[in-house]
Amino acid sequence: MEYAIKEIARVIGAKTNQLLDDTVSLLLTDSRRLSFPEKSLFFALKTKTNDGHRYIQELYKLRVRNFVVSDMLPEFESMKDANFLIVKDTLRALQKLATHHRKQFNIPVIGITGSNGKTIVKEFPYQLLHNEFNIVRSPDRKSVV
């Protein structure tokens, strides 16, 4: 599913440096997982041990042009063909966008939690029911978001 950058900016309540007309279909929080830079929106998440803002210049060189940031650093000013959506908290912005996306679908959600067995519990009903029902599930072992 594609989203216009303008729509994403509205949904997450972002300020912008400028707003170039663009669409994205992939969300990126780990610069090492880049696959389609032209369609990616990078969220510069901050953790206790890392800061996603450190990877923006590298991603820009790899053709990513859409970023959600909490700090507009001086080195970003030269990236004139990039969109920077500026928010107070990038994690909260990601959560807002995920909530908005989820509301586009009128389907029940089943959450599976716990320390062990989530993947098999997710896969078992899929294997039983996917021929009769339209089922959406997280890929691979990404059962916890």
Which role does the model predict for each range below?
Residues 1-96:
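N-terminal leader/targeting and accessory segments in enzymes
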